[in-house]
Amino acid sequence: MTVETTNSSPVPGTIDAPPSAHGLIDRSKLRTLAQRSNRRGAARLAVHLGCVGTTGTLVWLTLPVWYLLVPAMVLHGITIVTMFAPMHECTHRTAFSSRRANDLVGWCAGVLSSYNATYYRYYHAWHHRYTQDPARDPELMYPRASDRLAYLKEISGLMFWYRRAIDYPALALGRAGALPFAPAEARHAIALSMSCQLLIYLAAAVAIAMGHNAALYFWFLPALLAMPLLRGYLITEHTGCSPDGNGLSNTRTTVALFPIRLLMWNMPYHAEHHLFPSIPFHQLPALHRQLRGRLAHVAPGYLATNREIFLSL
């Protein structure tokens, strides 16, 4: 599927609130909620990295015992693949008040979680702007699961890794010209960023081939084992929601347990985030309290929502 462009394309990489958000929150309240904080961003990042270190220690302690090692790697993998969340927050430049901190942390978090922050910023801006538009939403470049087998392939992570193997080398070679959300002036930066990221993966792979298995046990295998959990999280965000531009009904908020809210940087409040993408992660719970009664989709949990999606196919 191709993503169509229009003659009135906004400034690439910028994200405004959709029309459906207008009038929902008082402007003075929005200004208060939109205050970004280096301190809050650094604190959340420190907690997340602490979880990475703690679960990594569990992997190290269980290395000789496979029946303990696999659960430890799953736990560790969860902390790695959820580095997607700070990457996402940083591409909005809302994790920190410092633009430099957002860009640096976002890129590093993307490397860990197998996303490229430079590319994702432009991709994601169009996703916000054209949410659920099958011709222009980049998330719909690849069709959503239309049957149970396709759902299982998506949830397993197989399609994610396949697309990474195809798309990322092409982007590193500068082949972003067919993507309308990647402006000409950004394509060199995307190619350079992607090349640097792939070199890191290549260096890790070479180290493994030479018998140095740290990246295998503390990064690659944990990410592979935990990726289905991230896919199960992401598939709930828009699947089954209204196929239109109404931010009150085209995105799902999920009532999540504290560990999920912690590691996903409050992104379970996803409808709120889509309505007001300039609000930083630490203010999303307050925004949820303001908006909950207006939202069409507030789900009780990820297992229940995935079950509903699966049974609907």
PLM ranges: what are they?
Residues 7, 179-237, 246, 251-252, ...:
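C-terminal membrane-associated helical module and adjoining short loops/tails
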Residues 1-77, 111-216, 281-313:
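Non-catalytic, topology-defining segments of multipass membrane proteins
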Residues 77-87, 116-120, 164-167, 218-245, ...:
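Transmembrane alpha-helical segments that form the membrane-embedded catalytic/substrate-channel core
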